[in-house]
Amino acid sequence: MRNIRHYILLCILTGGFSIGAAAEEIIAIKADRIDTVTSGVIENGIIVIADGKIKAIGNDIEIPEAAEIIDVPDKTIFPGLVNPSSRIGLSQSARGGPASNPHYRVVDELYPHQDQYKRILGAGFTTLGLLPGEKGFVRYYPGYGYWPDSGPPSTGIAGQGAIVRPTGQNPEEMIVAESGFVMIHFQANDKVKNVITSALDSAKGKMSSTEPKVLPLVLALQGKVPTFVLCNSPGEILHLLKLLEPYNKMKLVLVEGNETYRVTKELVKRKIPVVLPAQIEFESNTRTRINVPRMLAEAEVKIAIRPEFDNVAGHEDFLRKIAELVKSGLNREIAKKAITIHPAEMLGIDYRLGSLDVGKDANLLILSGDPLDVGTTIDKVMIEGKIVHEAP
């Protein structure tokens, strides 16, 4: 004990402890309802936040004397929204292919001083999974955001996606994980398959390598980072699953497959989750409308839902679109998980984001009512315990 006291005194004298570390910033939020997403709803609850983390949550919580109290009667607290699949705020020219570019990092495109980020904060999004861009995959159209390019699609290994907060004075302040996942653009032809398997096999023989073109694939092969795959048709999905059978530790996430409901048995068997747009689809070659998120959820495929359009308007309209999916049959609790904890799990960051639990980042929304009621408004947005948006 004496040695510990001497060590602490030495740290204070030599600057080993910062002022921030010595004095915790403590906040206590009192609200009518706290929807944790993973542990139910707490009525008349309290959340205690210290240094950006949730320290306590419940009904009968002792509030520290030093805490700043935010009393929000008649309000609901909900986790910050997580969009796992976006290109918003990115405008660098796309790259060509088919090719293997695992060293390409989307963080090198980040520019934080954009009105788009401020506006999607106001829409409740506290975390984004940003995709590496490719010729034939996305192109920026002023006023509309990122849409599929009409040119020949690039395929292969697109690079490393980033996980970011949509706020910060510089790119470093935005980054949650600069190499959060590996992105593959898949097509079921021999050339694309050879590009992918050649890169993976090469990395498999260099598992201790730290080379920029190898390390991301090593981490993907080990399942230490997820692998997001853009795969458009049921047939392509079956080809993909067959191709990647030898690499069985990879954590696959399918992106954008509107017909994935046709291969649900294979997805359930492999425990592969899917990212879907918030929209009611038309069944192929018919005028029949179908709720694909509902169909996958009922088949016990884990889903995450992203905005229908990858622009500001799509993000601002997101909760209304989720409410429409629920009205059309999507289970309400699954819908809430599909916009919070499920995308966090797919990105591999559920240990710190996606729900309101002790130990996690205090990323939360203060709402006027239920998050899936059309009339609900977002009063405040917090990221790591700091208010980053307030409604006028």
Annotate each PLM feature.
Residues 121-238, 242-251:
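Polyanionic/metal-chelating signatures
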Residues 20-25:
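Boundary at the C-terminal end of the N-terminal hydrophobic targeting segment
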Residues 34, 38-78:
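Histidine-rich, glycine-flanked metal-binding segment
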Residues 7-18:
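Bacterial N-terminal signal peptides
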Residues 32, 47, 52, 74, ...:
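Divalent metal-coordination and catalytic microenvironments
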Residues 32-35, 43-45, 345, 357-392:
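C-terminal cap of metal-dependent C-N hydrolases
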Residues 93-95, 100-104, 226, 268, ...:
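His/Asp/Glu-enriched, well-ordered alpha-helical/loop segment
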